[in-house]
Amino acid sequence: MAIHLYKTSTPSTRNGAVDSQVKSNPRNNLICGQHHCGKGRNARGIITARHRGGGHKRLYRKIDFRRNAKDIYGRIVTIEYDPNRNAYICLIHYGDGEKRYILHPRGAIIGDTIVSGTEVPIKMGNALPLTDMPLGTAIHNIEITLGRGGQLARAAGAVAKLIAKEGKSATLKLPSGEVRLISKNCSATVGQVGNVGVNQKSLGRAGSKCWLGKRPVVRGVVMNPVDHPHGGGEGRAPIGRKKPVTPWGYPALGRRTRKRKKYSETLILRRRSK
């Protein structure tokens, strides 16, 4: 990823950075409109997810997470920007004439060939079942349910590791540090998702954050008591509690939010690390 730093002409561009090489030129048959209603509101218009709203209009790119074009070689034609995710996408031209978008694997360049199937080489960008991969393989775009398409490790820079295979299940270490079991018949893509340094790029100003649909975040300690439990006081006052709480009074630090009786509880061998 080539980062272009702005010249220090104005305060808003003094610390800004953009990608100078990756552009967006989507194909008409691989995009569709999406209706963003609410933006953090429920059916009654009440805010249910804070700090969301606004943002630039987007066209959705149809990404091939299933990789079900078996044993057909494809060639990477372009590497494009996708406004709906922080990872880049690749336009693939397959040998049968079909064109699809996939997530851009780290290190893949224009002209590389990829393929998906059961007996394909362990090469970056190839998709194959976990049962055909050797231990220690770095993977992304991992299926949870067979045939449903990849659902895990799809963000920029995400990578999981295949650490064991026993019986009908494979043991994976996910990017969060969680260790869990997944069926060996599920597919995954070899390699790491590209655009690794996206979290190190500085937007430079608040307006760039608003273009992404993210609203400002206000600290509770500067609010009034009617708006937040941390609010109130004369001048710069402490929160007045032993531990921080959420705007609704629940503990903000250390509280577990996962449901206890979830179906996948028996599949998780080690909880994610913070």
Curated annotation (Swiss-Prot):
It is found in: Plastid, Chloroplast. GO terms for molecular function: mRNA binding; rRNA binding; structural constituent of ribosome; transferase activity. Pfam families: Ribosomal_L2, Ribosomal_L2_C. Belongs to the universal ribosomal protein uL2 family. Part of the 50S ribosomal subunit. PANTHER family: LARGE RIBOSOMAL SUBUNIT PROTEIN UL2M, RIBOSOMAL PROTEIN L2. This is Large ribosomal subunit protein uL2cz/uL2cy.
